[in-house]
């Protein structure tokens, strides 16, 4: 059985409420997701965008990120990622630097194959970076064919799509018309980022899911920060949710206290 951990929206270097403590919290949450990957002994980690909170992260944040990804390399676990809208730059991306560190790779329209330790249960993983709105209508969604028809296929994207994302949340695209109908083949699954709530659905026979963010980015985000453990066996993909808190780190994620004040 091949196992892949799906992580998204880590927003490293986010100094929420102007607090350095929160910057550390986001880094700790990413570390916790790696704790889970190592604990589960997964065959790869996929990250579906917004690794960093903005295009110009601080040097300490980049170094902490590399240290965390280095833990995956020490465990022999590849780190496969796409670029989100928050960290996106005009030309070369942060993933182009990070991928120079051994086990990291920036996903593309060509498949990256992941298998279990014995070479069984192959998965072809694809990635499309966050697409700028003016480029959406003319974007070419053509993917290279997988090496074999027996591969499970996963496409990673960083977009808001209906029906998983409510219409009032950021003007989401229609998943069937705006994405799936424009692909040259339907993947087994669509692993998504950008939406910070954990949710899933099946659309046109494709399993579609958001793991949500690894830390709480807004006070209005009340879900449990989580990652997905994807299990692939005999051509079938199943999914299990693991809360970031199950890594066992103190105050990761940090609990919020909401106080309503009547005037």
Task: Describe the role of every protein-language-model region.
Residues 1-68:
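N-terminal active-site segment of His-dependent metallophosphoesterases
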Residues 6, 47, 202-203, 232:
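Generic beta-strand structural signal
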Residues 15, 131-133, 160, 233-235, ...:
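Generic structural motif
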Residues 45, 190, 240-242:
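Generic beta-strand hydrophobic packing signal
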Residues 55-209, 213-231:
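His/Asp/Glu-rich metal-coordinating catalytic cores
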Residues 112, 211-263:
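Binuclear metal-dependent phosphoesterase catalytic core
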């Amino acid at each position: 059985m091949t196992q892949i951990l799906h992580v998204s929206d880590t927003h490293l270097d986010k100094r929420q409420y102007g607090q350095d403590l929160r910057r550390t919290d986001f880094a700790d949450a990413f570390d916790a997701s790696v704790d889970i990957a190592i604990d589960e002994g997964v065959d790869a980690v996929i990250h579906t965008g917004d690794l960093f909170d903005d295009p110009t992260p601080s040097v300490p944040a980049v170094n902490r990120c590399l240290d965390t990804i280095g833990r995956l390399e020490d465990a022999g676990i590849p780190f496969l990622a796409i670029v989100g809208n928050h960290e996106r730059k005009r030309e070369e991306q942060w993933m182009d630097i990070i991928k120079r560190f051994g086990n990291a790779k920036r996903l593309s329209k060509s498949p990256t194959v992941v298998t279990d330790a014995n070479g069984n249960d192959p998965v072809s993983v694809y990635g499309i970076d966050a697409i700028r709105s003016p480029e959406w209508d003319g974007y070419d969604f053509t993917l290279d064919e997988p090496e074999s028809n027996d591969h499970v296929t996963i496409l990673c994207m960083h977009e808001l799509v209906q029906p998983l994302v409510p219409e009032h949340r950021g003007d989401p695209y229609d998943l069937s018309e705006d994405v799936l109908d424009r692909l040259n083949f339907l993947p087994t699954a669509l692993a998504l980022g950008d939406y910070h709530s954990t949710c899933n659905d099946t659309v046109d026979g494709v399993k579609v899911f958001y793991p949500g963010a690894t830390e709480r980015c807004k006070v209005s985000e009340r879900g449990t920060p989580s990652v997905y453990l994807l299990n692939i066996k005999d051509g079938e993909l199943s999914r299990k949710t693991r809360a970031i808190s199950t890594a066992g780190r103190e105050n990761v994620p940090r609990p919020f206290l909401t106080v309503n004040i009547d005037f």
